[in-house]
């Protein structure tokens, strides 16, 4: 039984963490290295950094930040945002990231998944999917550009295609739940888990300890990602893991 992963997510622009992280002993709420080190101490299994500014001039800044973080922190790092080519992937992986996450660029050019997987291995390629329920169509619809643009893609079908092209992991955000603290969209992850055989990370909706228990006990996801509940100390990773252990969920 593989241990389930608890993964904080940090939004970064210009090499700074943008949603202030409210740890008690943090002097600089925007310093990615200090925040990553604090999360490592708390027992996070991985970290995801999303470059929300992601323009050409920010890419070098992002690589420099990854170098600094990876020199100090010894847990897997996934970097997403603005990665649109194999060269972008290479820059981030060389800087010390373990995985690169691609979202809009993969929808626009699915062959980018295959090219990245062939060059770096499937385990380095995470396809991030933003999905929202479309009641009229009776399916989860894929959105791109930070959730701004609807596509014609069905999220479950797109997940299957992404894996066939070489995605080694899926990071799937429920736009319906994101920021609501109403719990993870278990129906979405059940549908995905029945279709693909790579690790799935659930994102969007974490609000309390029971939400983590529910997503791991009712869906086959391998990891759960959250941002604000961890950043503002509403939940600690230690509490999440202790609760999961009590419920028989295997965690690191």
UniProtKB/Swiss-Prot annotation:
Residues the record marks as active site: 11, 130
BP GO terms, sorted: L-histidine biosynthetic process
Listed InterPro entries: Aldolase_TIM, His_biosynth, HisF, IGPS_HisA/HisF, RibuloseP-bd_barrel
Compartments it resides in: Cytoplasm
Domain of life, per lineage: Bacteria
CDD domains xrefs: HisF (cd04731)
GO cellular component term of the entry, any: cytoplasm
Keyword Cytoplasm: yes
Gene Ontology MF terms: imidazoleglycerol-phosphate synthase activity; lyase activity
Enzyme Commission number(s) from the entry: 4.3.2.10
Biochemical pathway: Amino-acid biosynthesis; L-histidine biosynthesis; L-histidine from 5-phospho-alpha-D-ribose 1-diphosphate: step 5/9
Subunit structure: Heterodimer of HisH and HisF.
Role summary: IGPS catalyzes the conversion of PRFAR and glutamine to IGP, AICAR and glutamate. The HisF subunit catalyzes the cyclization activity that produces IGP and AICAR from PRFAR using the ammonia provided by the HisH subunit.
Classification via HAMAP family: HisF
Family note: Belongs to the HisA/HisF family.
Protein name, UniProt field: Imidazole glycerol phosphate synthase subunit HisF
Species classification: Bacteria, Bacillati, Bacillota, Bacilli, Lactobacillales
Gene: hisF
